[in-house]
Amino acid sequence: MTSFFKLKKLIFLSAALLAASSSAMAEEPNPIGDWWIIYGNGVPQKNIMYVADATSVVPSQKTKGATMDAVTLVYEEPGKPMNDVYNLEAQCSTGKVRFINGQSIERLAYTMRHLKVANQWQTPKEFWVQQALKFACAPGSRAKNDMAAVGKMEYLQMIEMLQQMFFKLAPIQQKSQMMDNIDSLLELKK
């Protein structure tokens, strides 16, 4: 099996796992997501984009009163996986989340592995998890919460688009980093 077909099969499996929280989406052969960037770390050559799918925000069938949310982490760094996918439950009234499951797709081997997740209810500490909670609980405030709509597309298209974004960001981030380094050397920065 060629690498491209292996990748496409694994991306499809990952998308299916991501869609497992939404039965309507899971029935589609190539589900279309409504993608939003909820956070990005902005580290040159090590960018990570945290992308949530609005179609995954549905009432949980597992926990009464909770809302499901799926977040994909797309990595730029070659030594990292291509992406990780986490399915979370959010309790909007208490401001708590818990991880249901997670999967990772390795960049070169195109293999999928299951990630260990802490499945107890917790107050989010990491910023991206806080953003995931806001994404699920305040859909009308996504733009106000510094989230950017990416558009409606298939999962593989979203991954490819973000990889292209990393490619376009690289020279801009390198120039910015170079200017910061020069400022530091000249002690112009306070």
Describe the function of each predicted region.
Residues T2-I11:
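Bacterial N-terminal signal peptides that target proteins for export
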